[in-house]
């Protein structure tokens, strides 16, 4: 089953605004860019068999994505929902049977978690999601790519489950501890400070010195 891995990414100048005033604008941009590049590098290294698509309105981000061998979909409309809807259409038009949406702000990506996620049996149609600690959606695997509407926002993992149930679509929820931590709020920064891997240490350093 051909799976398209989709990474939406804002212009770094517009990223991580909820971390203000804990981080300066420069720190927020450095943090967002570091996590984005780490995400691209991770999938290139561990899952080269899967196609990568970056959805962005930023030419700067587009150029970075291309250096990692990712395809780019320029989406100028505002909002994550519009971006991922465009990505789903792109996935369908390019003959992908599944689409995996991943944010570019996961603190630490774990190969074993993604291997488990991608190996789970997926009937057609189906939805497989990994909730964030705050009940957002940190991974959304849809088969076909447009199996359900995309409902990002507060408690979006619950919203995605509800819409799948309303449509009688199989929805599996898998809880993965590393994938559950995205960096969006001051509380997330506090959790990040408790982690000690090389990747998270580098992120913590950026938050203090950039």
UniProtKB/Swiss-Prot annotation:
Entry EC number(s): 2.7.7.106
Broad EC category: transferase
Catalysis: reaction(s): (2R)-3-phosphoglycerate + GTP + H(+) = 3-[(R)-glyceryl]-diphospho-5'-guanosine + diphosphate
Task performed by this protein: Guanylyltransferase that catalyzes the activation of (2R)-3-phosphoglycerate (3PG) as 3-[(R)-glyceryl]-diphospho-5'-guanosine, via the condensation of 3PG with GTP. It is involved in the biosynthesis of a derivative of the hydride carrier cofactor coenzyme F420, 3PG-F420.
Source domain of life: Bacteria
One GO MF term: GTP binding
GO biological processes: F420-0 metabolic process
Claim: GTP-binding is one of the keywords in the record: yes
Gene3D superfamilies: Spore Coat Polysaccharide Biosynthesis Protein SpsA, Chain A
Protein name as catalogued: 3-phospho-D-glycerate guanylyltransferase
InterPro entries: CofC, Nucleotide-diphossugar_trans
NCBIfam families, alphabetized: F420_cofC (TIGR03552)
The entry's keywords: GTP-binding, Nucleotide-binding, Nucleotidyltransferase, Transferase
Family: Belongs to the CofC family.
Pathway noted in the entry: Cofactor biosynthesis; coenzyme F420 biosynthesis
